């Protein structure tokens, strides 16, 4: 048994302390609180620095790493169809809830105090954007240019094309895929390093927010967080619960079955931490190896329901807080962009914030500097994101397996009825080879 990490070394605890200090500093010494704003800005710039390579590695590895494309084509098609439908529903749920509750209304954050030059650039980009221009802009002028400018949609498009081309090379392209996998490990290590600075960034961002706008602004941030948790819970029980019921099983029994994995995710804020166990458990529920091996790893990039809810709610919250007008056209544009950019997310702590930063840049209408408003509470919303993502992928695996008639329903019923008893003591590493298909180590 591993030694428990001291509380003071926990990132969760460090961020809590940093936020409390930031609130106190901003309240009692508002001028100094405003002065430490660069700490939050610097952290955001570090996050933006790795957006392009992270998305490239995740998407390319997920596509090029697929085995036996012809034999799993039907399963892959159904899986992608399910992912798109449910992800769209999740995005719409977040969009509807944040428009009804409007947690950011009344904050009246002055955008110019956040970063006037950047806001002017994004507003100009949004004003110049037509539908045709937007679609043409997805195609990069040069590959290097897409990565140099950090244009998320251009990077995503090139990554998809590169992934398919690499897959067509077969064994000849494997050295390149191996290199990308190793490069991805480096990128995710950089994420881990950057996330260690989260307390400093959260301190600077919260001190500035309270120093510039008062303690009252914290109430709105709390409303966003509570609203998000309730929305995720409702999505699991109503949307995923309804999908599960239509396919002959209970989402509550599924939650009970994967309760240990949920607890691990709750502690780590990363659904990646239970990937090997999920491969084992989904097969033991009666789904075929080929289905589990395709749906679970692919879902870690393409089926992130909790992240989808977070992205729409956070983006519109920033618009509400900064009094940035968003009409129906802007919100539809946001939805379309998120349908693409959310596929570059990964199940690691901070990935939702990374994709949010990329999305605000791609939309062009919302101030990226507004990310500073939610930096302090983003860490505390990551648990709900990760838990919702995990339940969503568990449900997706069973649903897709049933669609392609690769599910033993008798085994499913028996295992769910048992609640997973007897599995807890099994070491996941004993069965890492149970699932066939893509298990890229960098898909989080």
Swiss-Prot record:
Keywords associated with the record: Cell inner membrane, Cell membrane, Membrane, Symport, Transmembrane, Transmembrane helix, Transport
Region (Disordered): 422-444
Membrane topology category: Multi-pass membrane protein
Keyword Transmembrane helix assigned: yes
Pfam families found in the cross-reference section: SDF (PF00375)
Highest taxon of the lineage: Bacteria
Entry's localization field: Cell inner membrane
Gene Ontology terms: cellular component: plasma membrane
Molecular functions per Gene Ontology: fumarate transmembrane transporter activity; malate:proton symporter activity; succinate transmembrane transporter activity
Annotated transmembrane regions: 15-35, 46-66, 78-98, 143-163, 199-219, 224-244, 291-311, 332-352, 354-374
Signal among keywords: no
Gene Ontology annotations of biological process type: L-aspartate transmembrane transport
Gene3D superfamilies: Sodium:dicarboxylate symporter
PANTHER family documented for this protein: AEROBIC C4-DICARBOXYLATE TRANSPORT PROTEIN, PROTON/GLUTAMATE-ASPARTATE SYMPORTER
Family assignment from sequence similarity: Belongs to the dicarboxylate/amino acid:cation symporter (DAACS) (TC 2.A.23) family.
HAMAP family per UniProt: C4_dicarb_transport (MF_01300)
Role: Responsible for the transport of dicarboxylates such as succinate, fumarate, and malate from the periplasm across the membrane.
Protein name (database record): C4-dicarboxylate transport protein
Organism: Pseudomonas fluorescens (strain Pf0-1)
Lineage, broadest ranks: Bacteria, Pseudomonadati, Pseudomonadota, Gammaproteobacteria, Pseudomonadales
């Amino acid at each position: 048994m591993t030694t428990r990490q001291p509380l003071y070394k926990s990132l969760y605890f460090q961020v809590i302390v940093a936020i409390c200090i930031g609130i106190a500093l901003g309240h009692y010494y508002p001028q100094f609180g405003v002065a430490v704003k660069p700490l939050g800005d610097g952290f955001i710039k570090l996050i933006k620095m790795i957006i392009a390579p992270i998305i490239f590695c995740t998407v390319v590895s997920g596509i090029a790493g697929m085995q036996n494309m012809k034999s799993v084509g039907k399963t892959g098609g159904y899986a992608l169809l399910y992912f798109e439908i449910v992800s769209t529903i999740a995005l719409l749920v977040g969009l509807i809830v944040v428009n009804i509750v409007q947690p950011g209304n009344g904050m009246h954050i002055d955008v110019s105090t956040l970063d006037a030059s950047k806001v002017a650039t994004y507003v100009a980009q949004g004003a110049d954007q037509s539908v045709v221009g937007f679609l043409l802009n997805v195609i990069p002028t040069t590959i290097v240019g897409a990565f140099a400018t950090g244009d998320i949609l251009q990077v995503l498009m090139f990554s998809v094309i590169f992934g398919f081309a690499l897959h067509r090379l077969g064994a000849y392209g494997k050295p390149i895929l191996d290199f990308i996998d190793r490069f991805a490990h480096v990128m995710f290590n950089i994420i881990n390093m950057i996330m260690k600075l989260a307390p400093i960034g959260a301190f600077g961002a919260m001190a500035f927010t309270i120093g510039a706008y008062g303690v009252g602004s914290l109430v709105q941030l709390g409303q966003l967080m509570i609203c998000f948790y309730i929305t995720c819970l409702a999505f699991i029980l109503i949307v995923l619960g309804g999908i599960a019921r239509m396919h002959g099983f209970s989402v509550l029994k599924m939650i009970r079955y994967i309760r240990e994995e949920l607890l691990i995710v709750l502690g780590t804020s990363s659904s990646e931490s239970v990937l090997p166990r999920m491969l084992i458990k989904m097969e033991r529920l009666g789904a075929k190896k080929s289905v589990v091996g395709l749906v679970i790893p692919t879902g870690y990039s393409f089926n992130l329901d909790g992240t989808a809810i977070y992205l729409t709610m956070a983006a519109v919250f920033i618009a509400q807080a900064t009094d940035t007008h968003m009409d129906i056209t802007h919100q539809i544009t946001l939805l379309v962009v998120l349908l693409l950019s959310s596929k570059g997310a990964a199940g690691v702590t901070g990935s939702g914030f990374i994709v949010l930063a990329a999305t605000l840049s791609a939309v062009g209408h919302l101030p990226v500097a507004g990310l500073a408003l939610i930096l302090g509470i983003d860490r505390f919303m990551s648990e709900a994101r990760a838990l919702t993502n995990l339940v969503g992928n568990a449900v997706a695996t069973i649903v897709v397996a049933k669609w392609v008639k690769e599910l033993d329903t008798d085994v499913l019923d028996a295992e769910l009825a048992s609640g997973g008893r007897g599995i807890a003591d099994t070491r996941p590493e004993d069965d890492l080879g149970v699932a066939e298909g893509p298990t890229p180590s960098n898909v989080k």
